[in-house]
C-alpha cells in the first residue's frame, strides 16, 4: 500500500474502529503491538500500525480526507454513523493482512475511548442483533461472513474484521490456537521498527511484493513481475513520517548480499522510470522521485523518499481513486 492509500485506509479504519470508542484510557502503542502479536492468526503476512491522533494534526489532513473517500468508503461511513461513531475518539490502530486479502478485507485492533454499553444500546435501537464470537457479542455492519463486524474486548480496546477472522483472532488471543508471536520473524521486525512514526508496518513473503505493487503503480511501458522482483526479500519494514513534508522510509532484508545488490539495481531503474512518468504527467511540478535514495548494506536494501503534500495529491490524482 502506498502513502496515499495508507492515509486513506488509516482514515477509513479509524472510523471503523471508532465504532468501539467513547471512555478515556487508551492503551499505549507498545500494548497495541503486543495485542497484534498475541491476537493475530499465524496466516497474517503484514501488520500496519498507525496513530490517528497524529495523522489528524497533519497539514491539509481535511483536504486529504475528503479526496480519498470513494463510494464504497462513504457507504461504510454512513453505516457506522448510524451507531453514533466519532472518528476523533480513536487513538491507535493495528491492521492485519492475510494472503489474498484486499483493502476492504482487513482486520485489526483499535484503542481509544469507548463504551460497550453505549454501543449495545445504539445497536438495539436499530434492531442490530449481536452475533456470538468466541463467547463475546459481535455487531456486524454488513450481512454475510465477509461483512465487517466489531467486538468490544475491554475498556479502550476493540477488534474488527469478518466473523471468520474475528473468531481466529479471539481464539489466538485466548491461547486456543497459535498466534503471530509464535512466528519469530514478527516479534523481531516489530521490535526494530520506527515506532515514533504515525504510520509504520512490517511485511513478509508475498506481502512485500503486494506493498510495492501499490506503491509504484505506474512503470510506464515497463512491465514487471513484482513477485519475481522481490522473490529473494525475506521481510520489509516501513514507516511514514509526517511534518512539513511526508517521508517514506523502508528497509528490506534479502536472502543474500548478492540478491540485495541485484534488487538495488532494479530499484534504481524504477526510480528513473518513475521520474520520467512523473515529468510526463506533471510537467513543471517538483519531482519527488529525484530525491529518492536507494541504499545498500550487506544483505539489506534501504529506500527513502520525501515529498510535499501537494505532490502527494498530484500522485493520488494520477493513480485514480480506489472505491
Predicted stretch roles:
Residues 13-22:
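Bacterial N-terminal signal peptides
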Residues 29-146, 187-228, 265-295, 300-302, ...:
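Structural boundary/hinge residues at secondary-structure and domain interfaces
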Residues 2-14:
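Bacterial N-terminal signal peptides that target proteins for export
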Residues 148-212:
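A conserved glycine-rich beta-strand in the N-terminal activation segment of trypsin-fold
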Amino acid at each position: 500500500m502506498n502513502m496515499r492509500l495508507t492515509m486513506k485506509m488509516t482514515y477509513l479504519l479509524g472510523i471503523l474502529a471508532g465504532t468501539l470508542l467513547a471512555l478515556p484510557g487508551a492503551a499505549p502503542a507498545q500494548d497495541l503491538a503486543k495485542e497484534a502479536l498475541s491476537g493475530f492468526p499465524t496466516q497474517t503476512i503484514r501488520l500496519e500500525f498507525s496513530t490517528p491522533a497524529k495523522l489528524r494534526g497533519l497539514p491539509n489532513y481535511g483536504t486529504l480526507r475528503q479526496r480519498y473517500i470513494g463510494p464504497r468508503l462513504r457507504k461504510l461511513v454512513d453505516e457506522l454513523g448510524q451507531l453514533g461513531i466519532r472518528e476523533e475518539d480513536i487513538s491507535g490502530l493495528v491492521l492485519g493482512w492475510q494472503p489474498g486479502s484486499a483493502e476492504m478485507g482487513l482486520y485489526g485492533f483499535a484503542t481509544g475511548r469507548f463504551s460497550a454499553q453505549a454501543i449495545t444500546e445504539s445497536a438495539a435501537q436499530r434492531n442490530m442483533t449481536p452475533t456470538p464470537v468466541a463467547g463475546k457479542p459481535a455487531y456486524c455492519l454488513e450481512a454475510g461472513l465477509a461483512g465487517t463486524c466489531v467486538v468490544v474486548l475491554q475498556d479502550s480496546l476493540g477488534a474488527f474484521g469478518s466473523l471468520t477472522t474475528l473468531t481466529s483472532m479471539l481464539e489466538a488471543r485466548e491461547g486456543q490456537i497459535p498466534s503471530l508471536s509464535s512466528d519469530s520473524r514478527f516479534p523481531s521486525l516489530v521490535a526494530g521498527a520506527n515506532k515514533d512514526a504515525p504510520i509504520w508496518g512490517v511485511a513478509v513473503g508475498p506481502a512485500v511484493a503486494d506493498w510495492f505493487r501499490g506503491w509504484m503503480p505506474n512503470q510506464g511501458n515497463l512491465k514487471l513481475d513484482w513477485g519475481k522482483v522481490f522473490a529473494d526479500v525475506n521481510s520489509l519494514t516501513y514507516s511514514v513520517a509526517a511534518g512539513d513534508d511526508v517521508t517514506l522510509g523502508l528497509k528490506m532484508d534479502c536472502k543474500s548480499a548478492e540478491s540485495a545488490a541485484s534488487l538495488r539495481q532494479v530499484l534504481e531503474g524504477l526510480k528513473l522510470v518513475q521520474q520520467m512518468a512523473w515529468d510526463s504527467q506533471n510537467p513543471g511540478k517538483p519531482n519527488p522521485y529525484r530525491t529518492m535514495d536507494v541504499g545498500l548494506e550487506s544483505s539489506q536494501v534501504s529506500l527513502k523518499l520525501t515529498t510535499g503534500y501537494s505532490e502527494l495529491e498530484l500522485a493520488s490524482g494520477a493513480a485514480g481513486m480506489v472505491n
